[in-house]
């Protein structure tokens, strides 16, 4: 299957500048193509991942991906999709963000072989361009009326846009032109909001490299959920690729909770499963939705891809422990992941009566209630039911000498650490 046909089947193409021309190029030769990201933060979220998944699909089809981290454009900020001016970051913060993104993106691509990926930073070819060179060599190639008509600018005219953000599309166009000239890059990929920036780059290439220069642009549809809300957010906020911001367990849980109405679409967008495999999972969604086979596959594929096989096994282990209530097999690291959002208390390093301990921490409102819950078998320590009001909590009740997990009833968990 031609890579363009595959992307169309997956519903991953929104606009193309020259579908027939691009289809011919990718059929006849290996091409270089790029997608960029600005270091506006120290981590990508799963929304950022979408265009890079397309880039990876091209690599799997034998083409050479170029990953651009915008050390230069990041100093300005892309106005696309923004209702107000971005706050500028310090160069030091941008440099730190660049390195963080390099690490995350480095896990997604293969940097060896005939279709080896490369990673570039547009600061390297932009830093020495003087303001006079910028205006003379590039500014003169852009018609202000054309720039004003692009959605990325037009949408901001009423509230105002600075010259800095107005000029962003010129800098991005310079990137495409540079990669065309020095890396033989023929295609830029981006989200649907990048169409104006991409076409600006194509215009600059034709002016700088000649009217017969062959270059293409392709954008990806905005991904929304069946309920109309924005993809990539949970109740706790964005789902990050950085495991310190979103743990692998939380990452796994995000995908496992996908709505039946969305899961097949996500399998097409985010996994490398074949059409036959996805059709089989789609059938299971229709016939056996309660088994959630599609969601489990999606969660497993994504956790392995972004994190690792080991991280997936850890997420599955945590999920199983929480479902069964048997938490004794969990490590301290797994407990920190799985119980990140439960009420957490800090206890003294001392031997204390269970009833007194529950009340002193605030898990129980009174000794009377604590005794009643213990007597009735509603209190569990590390998964074991406690019905003895005389029990003493000591070091033997700690997992790896760091945590004690308390459960009240069937699902109410509390995490206790120690001073």
UniProtKB/Swiss-Prot annotation:
It comes from the Bacteria. InterPro entries: aa-tRNA-synth_I_CS, aa-tRNA-synth_Ic, Rossmann-like_a/b/a_fold, S4_RNA-bd, S4_RNA-bd_sf, SYY-like_C, Tyr-tRNA-ligase, Tyr-tRNA-ligase_bac-type. GO terms for biological process: tyrosyl-tRNA aminoacylation. Transmembrane segments: none annotated. Gene3D superfamilies: HUPs (3.40.50.620), RNA-binding S4 domain (3.10.290.10), Tyrosyl-Transfer RNA Synthetase (1.10.240.10). PROSITE patterns: AA_TRNA_LIGASE_I (PS00178), S4 (PS50889). Its EC number is 6.1.1.1. Residues 352-418 form the S4 RNA-binding domain. ATP binds at residue 233. A motif ('KMSKS' region) lies at residues 230-234. The keyword Nucleotide-binding applies. L-tyrosine binds at residues 34, 168, 172. It catalyses: tRNA(Tyr) + L-tyrosine + ATP = L-tyrosyl-tRNA(Tyr) + AMP + diphosphate + H(+). The keyword Ligase applies. One of its GO terms (molecular function) is RNA binding. A motif ('HIGH' region) lies at residues 39-48. One of its GO terms (cellular component) is cytosol. Pfam families: SYY_C-terminal, tRNA-synt_1b. Keywords: Aminoacyl-tRNA synthetase, ATP-binding, Cytoplasm, Ligase, Nucleotide-binding, Protein biosynthesis, RNA-binding. It is found in: Cytoplasm. HAMAP family: Tyr_tRNA_synth_type1. Belongs to the class-I aminoacyl-tRNA synthetase family. TyrS type 1 subfamily. Catalyzes the attachment of tyrosine to tRNA(Tyr) in a two-step reaction: tyrosine is first activated by ATP to form Tyr-AMP and then transferred to the acceptor end of tRNA(Tyr). Homodimer. This is Tyrosine--tRNA ligase. It comes from Listeria welshimeri serovar 6b (strain ATCC 35897 / DSM 20650 / CCUG 15529 / CIP 8149 / NCTC 11857 / SLCC 5334 / V8). The lineage of its organism: Bacteria, Bacillati, Bacillota, Bacilli, Bacillales.
């Amino acid at each position: 299957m031609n890579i363009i046909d595959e992307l169309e089947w997956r519903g991953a193409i929104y606009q193309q500048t020259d579908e027939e021309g691009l289809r011919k190029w990718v059929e006849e030769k290996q091409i270089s193509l790029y997608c960029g990201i600005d270091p506006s933060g120290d981590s990508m979220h799963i929304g950022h991942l979408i265009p890079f998944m397309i880039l990876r699909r091209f690599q799997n089809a034998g083409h050479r991906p170029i990953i651009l981290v915008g050390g230069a454009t990041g100093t300005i900020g892309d106005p696309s999709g923004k209702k107000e001016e971005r706050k500028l970051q310090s160069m030091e913060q941008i440099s730190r963000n660049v390195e963080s993104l390099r690490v995350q993106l480095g896990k997604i691509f293969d940097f060896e072989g005939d279709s080896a990926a490369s990673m570039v930073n547009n600061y390297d070819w932009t830093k020495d361009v003087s303001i006079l060179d910028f205006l003379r060599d590039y500014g003169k190639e852009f018609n202000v009326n054309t720039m004003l008509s692009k959605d990325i600018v037009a949408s901001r005219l009423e509230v105002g846009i600075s010259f800095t953000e107005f000029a962003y599309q010129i800098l991005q166009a310079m990137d495409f032109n540079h990669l065309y000239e020095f890396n033989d890059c023929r295609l830029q990929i981006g989200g649907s909001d990048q169409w104006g920036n991409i076409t600006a780059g194509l215009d600059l290439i034709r002016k700088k490299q000649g009217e017969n220069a062959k270059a293409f642009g392709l954008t990806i549809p905005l991904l929304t959920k069946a309920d109309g809300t924005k993809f990539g957010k949970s109740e706790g906020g964005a789902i990050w690729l950085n495991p310190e911001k979103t743990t692998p367990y939380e990452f796994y849980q995000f995908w496992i909770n996908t709505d039946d109405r969305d899961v097949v679409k996500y399998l097409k967008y985010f996994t490398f499963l074949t059409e036959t495999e996805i059709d089989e999972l789609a059938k299971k969604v229709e016939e056996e939705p309660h088994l959630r086979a599609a969601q489990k596959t999606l969660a497993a594929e994504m956790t392995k891809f972004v994190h690792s096989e080991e991280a997936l096994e850890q997420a599955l282990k945590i999920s199983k422990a929480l479902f069964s209530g048997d938490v004794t097999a969990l490590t301290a690291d797994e407990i920190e992941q799985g119980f990140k959002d439960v009420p957490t208390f800090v206890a003294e390093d001392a031997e204390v009566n269970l009833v007194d301990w529950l009340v002193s921490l605030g898990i129980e409102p009174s000794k009377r209630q604590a005794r009643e819950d213990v007597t009735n078998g509603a209190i569990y320590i590390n998964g074991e039911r406690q019905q003895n009001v005389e029990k003493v909590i000591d070091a033997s009740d700690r997992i790896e000498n760091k945590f004690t997990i308390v459960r009240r009833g069937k699902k109410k968990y509390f995490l206790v650490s120690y001073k």
